Amino acid sequence: MTQAHVLRDRAVYEERSTTRSRTIWTRPVDPALDVELVHEWMHEPEVVKYWDMAWPVERIAAYLADHDADPYRANYLTFVDDTPVGYLEVYDPAHDVLAAHYPVEPGDVGAHVLIGDKDFRGRYSVSLGLATNRFLFQRPGAVRIVGEPDVRNHNLLSLLVFLGFHKAGELDLPEKRAALMLCDRADFERLSSGPRRRRQLQASEG
């Protein structure tokens, strides 16, 4: 695996996993330092199926640099302790091609997410998903998370429902047939709280 730059001092969010007793945290992508890692993840077979970005490293570098310069986008790496495990793209749907396919509302936050380290798929998916939602909802004005995963990605769709999303329809986007998945802040907070729900979450990763 590509040697990662940890850069813990750049963390913009962190939490202690109650089910794993490990720290999940997030920092912005550094296009120059992180390109090799993102390039490696984009060539993972499970990622290629849905992201279709198995590009040369130079093209990945240009892609990350473009996002870094875009005021309506931000890319992040997610870590478990000092291990990089995931990649997150956050965007403003009002300034994305998605705006032509669904009624954007104030407070919508778009997100693309992948778990790049295959050792953390499955057993850490719920903890990482919860942390990602909490990170997104801490953004100023964030009211609803918007996702548009490939309709074939049944594992991700099931996980999103478990995390408080609901399917609002299907969209024909330029690169895929997508499920429009929405998660309202109030629904997420209600779903992720309470002793019964905590037991369900713990059991899901037991």
Where in this protein do the model-derived segments appear?
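Conserved GNAT acetyl-CoA-binding A-motif
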Residues: 138-149
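Active-site rim helix/loop that mediates acceptor-substrate recognition in acyltransferases
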Residues: 54-75
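Conserved acetyl-CoA-binding loop-helix of GNAT-fold acetyltransferases
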Residues: 122-138, 158, 162
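Conserved active-site alpha-helix within GNAT-family acetyltransferase domains
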Residues: 151-169
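Helix-loop element at the rim of GNAT/NAT acetyltransferase active sites that forms part
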Residues: 40-54
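Conserved catalytic-core motifs of GNAT/GCN5-like acyltransferases
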Residues: 92-94, 148, 166-180
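Acetyl-CoA-dependent GNAT
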Residues: 69-108, 114-120
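Conserved N-terminal entry element of GNAT/NAT acetyltransferase domains
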Residues: 1-32, 189-206
